[in-house]
């Protein structure tokens, strides 16, 4: 897993953006991940974040998609607050600001889901991704009233709530349905699995706090009648159902699975053989590793663009002070002599495992520090290797 440090730090344009986790990633995974909530008090600095920052995130969101919402008791119809127009032959969409402002004054919550290409949001999300070893998706919530955006519900993903402006009261209840999947929304199951009556937690999340909530835990974040803005970073691992679906897609390779069905007595023997084939495939280590390789290979990490270094033919190497990290959420395969980053599988010899291992254990390590750790290596070749792996989007620069 990446990011074993208690404090993960990222810098851009001289502004420090960091999340201070009060547990290591290994302890978090063992004691908290998918098990119980965890509150990180004063985990982020909010000095560099303002309503101007929040406005810019909303302005750059695609308001026409279903990922952008305005909620007041229910999700409002798009036509109520978005207009379409032709801009020199291009269909565009924009917020009808007077209407949006009016809804916000009445207590509505503005929601932007699946945020991409926002540097500050991306840096927080990347730290959480490295801390958990999982894919992440980021959302933003802005409100000014005292009404909740949704009634008490559970999420089908683990979430890190990062409070950046103002406060929110969180009322949290233990799960009534354990580990719900994305098809098992609380609104469809609340009668069968009702919310407990006694809260597990009732607290105020303040600016700078980060709150981790596992999937399935009932919660109701309540605005307190004051301006509030928070990010929600959801984490997405491979689930057992994903593996089962993958296994079933392999079954047509077996002749028994391709047979037609007749009466029960005629089909029973063949179905028993199918069950044996399925069990053998499902429990084979080779199947599991192949699935995980495919899952990780399909994952993409948005690395920072560095045209002035990798696009300039006169630049032969990344700067010595540049920070280096792996373009992956997890160091999957490293102990077996390979890593997968942005769809590229990189086979490693013993020295390569040590090199990538150093980067994995210390994301953001400088090129100069890497060179110093391998005094017997050919410095010129090492610099060239690191530069080429950055150019191939296997590694990326973090601070240069």
Question: Over which residues does each language-model region extend?
Answer:
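Long, charge-rich alpha-helical interaction segments
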Residues: 248-297
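Acidic, low-complexity/disordered tracts enriched in E/D and polar residues
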Residues: 281-360, 383, 387, 398-400
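Long, charge-rich, low-complexity alpha-helical segments
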Residues: 3, 12, 23, 33-35, ...
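Active-site region of the double-stranded beta-helix
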Residues: 7, 12-31, 44-209, 218-265
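Short acidic (Asp/Glu) and glycine-rich catalytic loops that position anionic groups and cofactors
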Residues: 36, 226, 251-259, 336-338, ...
């Amino acid at each position: 897993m990446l990011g074993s440090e208690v404090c993960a730090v990222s810098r851009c344009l001289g502004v420090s953006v960091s999340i201070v986790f009060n547990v290591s990633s290994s302890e978090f995974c063992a004691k908290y991940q998918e098990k119980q909530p965890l509150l990180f008090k004063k985990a982020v600095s909010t000095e560099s974040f303002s309503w101007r920052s929040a406005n810019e995130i909303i302005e750059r969101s695609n308001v026409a998609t279903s990922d952008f919402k305005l909620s007041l008791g229910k999700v409002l119809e798009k036509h109520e607050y978005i207009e379409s127009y032709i801009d020199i032959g291009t269909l565009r969409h924009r917020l009808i600001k007077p209407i949006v402002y009016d809804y916000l004054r009445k207590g509505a919550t503005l929601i932007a889901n699946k945020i991409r290409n926002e540097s500050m949001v991306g840096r927080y999300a990347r730290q959480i991704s490295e801390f958990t070893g999982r894919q992440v998706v980021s959302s933003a919530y802005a409100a000014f009233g005292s009404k909740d955006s949704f009634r008490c519900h559970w999420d089908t993903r683990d979430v890190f709530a990062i409070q950046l402006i103002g406060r929110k009261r969180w009322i949290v209840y233990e799960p009534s349905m354990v580990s719900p999947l994305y098809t098992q929304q609380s609104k469809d199951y609340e009668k069968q699995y009702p919310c407990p009556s006694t809260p597990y937690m009732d607290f105020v999340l303040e600016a700078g706090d980060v709150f981790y909530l596992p999937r399935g835990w009932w919660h109701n974040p309540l605005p307190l009648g004051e301006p509030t803005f928070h990010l929600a970073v959801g984490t997405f691992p491979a689930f057992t159902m994903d593996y089962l679906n993958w296994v079933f897609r392999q079954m047509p390779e077996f002749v028994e699975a391709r047979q037609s069905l007749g009466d029960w007595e005629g089909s029973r023997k063949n179905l028993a053989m199918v069950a044996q084939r399925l069990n053998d495939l499902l429990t084979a280590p080779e199947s599991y590793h192949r699935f995980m390789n495919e899952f990780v290979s399909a994952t993409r990490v948005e690395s920072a663009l560095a045209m002035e270094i990798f696009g300039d033919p006169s630049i032969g190497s990344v700067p010595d002070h540049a920070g280096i990290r792996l373009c992956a959420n997890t160091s999957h395969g490293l102990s077996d002599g390979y890593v997968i980053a942005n769809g590229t599988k990189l086979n490693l010899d013993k020295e390569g495992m040590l090199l990538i291992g150093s980067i994995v254990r210390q994301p953001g390590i400088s090129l100069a520090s890497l060179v110093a750790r391998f005094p017997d290596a050919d410095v010129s070749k090492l610099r060239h290797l690191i530069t080429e792996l950055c150019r191939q989007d296997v590694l990326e620069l973090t601070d240069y």
